[in-house]
Amino acid sequence: DTDEGERWLCPDGSGYYGRLYSERRSGFRLTVFCRDFETPAWFRRSVMYQIFPDRFAFSDDDTASRGIEYHKSLGQTPELHKSLDEPVRYWPREFETSYSPDDFYGGTLRGIESKLPYLKELGVTCLYLNPIVEARSNHRYDSSDYLKVDPILGTNEDFTHLCVTARGMGIRIMLDGVYSHTGADSVYFNLYGAYPDTGACQGTQSPYYSWYDFRHFPDDYRCWWGFKDLPEVNERNGAWQDFVVSGEDSVVKTWLRRGASGWRLDVADELPDDTLALIR
């Protein structure tokens, strides 16, 4: 509904944003599914609200600033904006040869929790959070530590408290699992030596070495869409599957125990079908 009457946003075959029309356009949808495919009962007919944690809500404490200092202690160069009015930085700084998405606005898990009454009033029954685990970037699709909330957002305990409070209001929490690749600056790959354990690129004796596909060790490795900061993993590797999916203390099971109700899988189309079945 607009001042000029109804407008319909419809796809136009370009693959981009589509076009606005003054009348409803005819179209079609082809949906193919297995009749016996089961989805969680709580998710059916749920009202989902997506949150990008860094930009949603803030807490009246020093969580974000302490998290920034933690990342600096790893040799990283994050920036914390003073207000939401400041523009997003999308260009390289003087000391960089390429853009690094590491400017933050300071949203936190406690900030999200403070907005739960508002979200409940909207009728939300499921919160889908973009990645919350420790990572170098503000989007956090370059996981550094799968088992730890990014300190800029808070703590693992903050996450559990958020889930408990949300569940009491009839709201479930869904997490974003990024499992086709890790960050190069991570516990697992450790390209810059920021973490104490031996990462895959630091030696073949690393417990994570078998996760990755090195064509020529240590500099030439398979990476997601050619981005060297996103080394791809072998999702059929037994050690990886045990750590992330099937082990008693796996990443998937740990976050469910902490209070998450389900997972959205990043680039699920790039994960092997048998790995998807294992996760389910």
Where are these regions (language model features)?
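Short linear motifs at secondary-structure transitions and domain/linker junctions
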Residues: 22-29, 122, 207-210, 269
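Aromatic- and carboxylate-enriched substrate-binding clefts and catalytic-loop regions
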Residues: 268-274, 279-280
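Substrate-binding/active-site clefts of carbohydrate-active enzymes
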Residues: 52-125, 132-258, 279
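Conserved beta-strand positions in the central sheet of alpha/beta enzyme cores
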Residues: 128, 174, 264-266
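Conserved, well-ordered alpha-helix/loop/beta-strand core segments that scaffold catalytic motifs
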Residues: 261-264, 270
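The feature marks proteins involved in alpha-glucan
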Residues: 1-48, 58-83
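Active-site regions of oxyanion-processing enzymes, predominantly non-cytosolic
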Residues: 48-51, 265
